[in-house]
C-alpha cells in the first residue's frame, strides 16, 4: 500500500470550473450546487487523468463524503476500470493506493482513539451480517472506513467473522 495526500483545493459551482485547481496528484475539487454533486480529483497515481466521483444520490449510485476534524473521507473505494486502473480509498485526508504496484494491506494502520469505536462496533454486530456502511450509520460521527477497519481488527481478534465471496465486507459477531 502506498499513502498519498488528499487535498480539497476548492468548492465550485460547476464541473467546468474544477480543472484549474487540479495541479498535483491527489488535488481535489468539490462541485457543490445546493449540496455536494461531484468530487473531481487528479488521479493519485500521477497519470494526469481527472477522476469524477458522483456524490449526489439523486443522480444514481453515489459515494459518500465525510468531513470531520480528523480529515475528509470518501466511501466506498474508487476503482478505475480503464486507463491506469488505479484502486484507492480516501481516508482522513490520505489516499491509500492498492494493487500490485502498491501492496494490499491497510489493516495495520492504527488509531490511538480506536478503542472506543471498536467497542461500539462490537456492540452493533449481531448474528446477521451487516456492512461497514450499515454499522457506521448506527454510530453517530463515525465513518465507514473507520468501522471497516475496526471490523477487520475484530476478525483478527476472533470476535467477528467476515462473509466470503458476495458477502465480503459484511460482518457478524462470533458468540
Where are the regions a protein language model picked out?
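Short amphipathic alpha-helical interface segments
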Residues: 111-144, 148-149, 153
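Residue-level detection of the helix-turn-helix DNA-binding "recognition helix"
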Residues: 43, 152, 156
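N-terminal cysteine/histidine-rich coordination modules
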Residues: 1-50, 58
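Compact nucleic-acid interaction/catalytic patches
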Residues: 32, 38-40, 47-81
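Short flanking/linker segments adjacent to small metal-binding domains or redox-active Cys/His motifs
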Residues: 84-117, 121-127
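Short helix-coil boundary/hinge micro-motifs
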Residues: 21-25, 30-35, 72-92
Amino acid at each position: 500500500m502506498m499513502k498519498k495526500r488528499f487535498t480539497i483545493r476548492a468548492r465550485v459551482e460547476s464541473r467546468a470550473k474544477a480543472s484549474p485547481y487540479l495541479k498535483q496528484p491527489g488535488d481535489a475539487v468539490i462541485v457543490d450546487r445546493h449540496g455536494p454533486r461531484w468530487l473531481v480529483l487528479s488521479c493519485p497515481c500521477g497519470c494526469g487523468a481527472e477522476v469524477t466521483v458522483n456524490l449526489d444520490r439523486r443522480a444514481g449510485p453515489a459515494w459518500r463524503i465525510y468531513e470531520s476534524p480528523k480529515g475528509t473521507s470518501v466511501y466506498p473505494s474508487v476503482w478505475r476500470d480503464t486507463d491506469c486502473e488505479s484502486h484507492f480509498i480516501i481516508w482522513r485526508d490520505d489516499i491509500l493506493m492498492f494493487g500490485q504496484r502498491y501492496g494490499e494491506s491497510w489493516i495495520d494502520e492504527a488509531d490511538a482513539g480506536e478503542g472506543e469505536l471498536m467497542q461500539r462496533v462490537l456492540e452493533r454486530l449481531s448474528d446477521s451480517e451487516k456492512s461497514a456502511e450499515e454499522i457506521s450509520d448506527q454510530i453517530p460521527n463515525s465513518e465507514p472506513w473507520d468501522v471497516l477497519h475496526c471490523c477487520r481488527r475484530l476478525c483478527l481478534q476472533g470476535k467477528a467473522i467476515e462473509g466470503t465471496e458476495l458477502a465480503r465486507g459484511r460482518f457478524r459477531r462470533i458468540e
